[in-house]
Amino acid sequence: MAVPKKRTSIYKKRIRKNIWKKKGYWAALKAFSLAKSLSTGNSKSFFVRKISNQTLE
């Protein structure tokens, strides 16, 4: 079984953790941007069918 020879430094650990956090931040930002464009109707990646509020008589 492969075992690391030395302990990972706190400096490297912090860098890796920040990279991981930044990926989550960008994913959340993209999701929020997409939701915003869908709600305003300016989305270019989704085709949303608009339902009219007509009553059947």
From Swiss-Prot:
GO terms for cellular component: chloroplast; large ribosomal subunit. One of its GO terms (molecular function) is structural constituent of ribosome. Disulfide bonds: none annotated. Its main location: plastid. GO terms for biological process: translation. The keyword Plastid applies. Keywords: Chloroplast, Plastid, Ribonucleoprotein, Ribosomal protein. Transmembrane segments: none annotated. It is found in: Plastid, Chloroplast. Component of the chloroplast large ribosomal subunit (LSU). Mature 70S chloroplast ribosomes of higher plants consist of a small (30S) and a large (50S) subunit. The 30S small subunit contains 1 molecule of ribosomal RNA (16S rRNA) and 24 different proteins. The 50S large subunit contains 3 rRNA molecules (23S, 5S and 4.5S rRNA) and 33 different proteins. Belongs to the bacterial ribosomal protein bL32 family. Component of the chloroplast ribosome (chloro-ribosome), a dedicated translation machinery responsible for the synthesis of chloroplast genome-encoded proteins, including proteins of the transcription and translation machinery and components of the photosynthetic apparatus. This is Large ribosomal subunit protein bL32c.
